[in-house]
Structure formats: structure tokens, C-alpha cells
Amino acid sequence: MTTENRTPRIIEAKEIMTLLPHRFPFLLVDRVVDFQEGEWLKAIKNISVNEPCFTGHFPNEPILPGVLILEALAQSMGLLAFKTHEIQGGELFYFAGIDDARFKRPVLPGDQMELYVEVIKERRGITSFIGRATVNGEVACEAKLMCARR
């Protein structure tokens, strides 16, 4: 990510919903706080005690499931892809792969999860990314992700 002085490029929830097909309870990006087409994107997800997953994961010790952290990263990846490429009617970016996922700290109710995805490589409609979710500067999850344009 570049460190030059510039105004952050924000994408609010209303626009996110025009870009992604996901809806409650599976829309897992609240706001994009900055991005650079074809390079990187930073977003946030505020974790509420009212998240439906906490009913069963776990009733007396609520922890955001790792798969939902990965899904939030995948949705961030999709947002970057949609903002980078002109899309023909009906085209989507599909989550196509994951490697080297590591979970380093729990994400709990009340946390603000910061999501960061960066393009590593793009070839023949497949884009590879590195993704990282943090809470208060501490890494919660890191993974290599891929999406496919279809």
C-alpha cells in the first residue's frame, strides 16, 4: 500500500450492496475505508453481540467463527475486483480458493475487525490476493485467497 498523502476513497454500505450479491446475515463488510484499484483495499466489519452466529458459537463464550472471518476477507476481495474491472451484465467474482489460512487471535463481540486485501497476481480471469484481518492492530487471521471472474 502506498503511503502518499491523499484523500481516502470510501465505499459506504449502500454502494457495497450494489456491488456484492450478499445480504444479511452474510454481508460481512460494513464500510470500505480506502482502496486503490488493482492494488489493495481496506475495510471494516463491526462485530455486534447480536450477530446470528453467536447463538451457537458459543452460547457462553461468543467467538466469531473463522470461516466468517475468511468470508469477510473474500467479500473485501470481491469489492476490490468489482472496483478494478468493468463488469458485463450478470458477471460475478467467485471465491475460488484459499491457502495458508492462519488464525492468531479470536474476534469477539464489540471488536472492530479491520480487513485488508492486496493483489498478488492476476492471470486469465483468476486473481490471487493476500488477506489479513486485524483487531486493534493484532492479526486475527491471514490467508492467501483467489477469485475467479465468471
From Swiss-Prot:
A Gene Ontology biological process term: lipid A biosynthetic process
Keyword vocabulary terms for this entry: Cytoplasm, Lipid A biosynthesis, Lipid biosynthesis, Lipid metabolism, Lyase
Molecular function terms, GO-annotated: (3R)-hydroxyacyl-[acyl-carrier-protein] dehydratase activity
EC numbers on record: 4.2.1.59
Subcellular location, record wording: Cytoplasm
Active site: H57
InterPro entries: FabA_FabZ, FabZ, HotDog_dom_sf
Recorded catalytic activity of this chain's protein: a (3R)-hydroxyacyl-[ACP] = a (2E)-enoyl-[ACP] + H2O
Tagged with keyword Lipid biosynthesis: yes
One GO CC annotation: membrane
UniProt superkingdom: Bacteria
Class of this enzyme: lyase
Task of the protein: Involved in unsaturated fatty acids biosynthesis. Catalyzes the dehydration of short chain beta-hydroxyacyl-ACPs and long chain saturated and unsaturated beta-hydroxyacyl-ACPs.
Similarity remark: Belongs to the thioester dehydratase family. FabZ subfamily.
PANTHER family per UniProt: 3-HYDROXYACYL-[ACYL-CARRIER-PROTEIN] DEHYDRATASE
Protein name: 3-hydroxyacyl-[acyl-carrier-protein] dehydratase FabZ
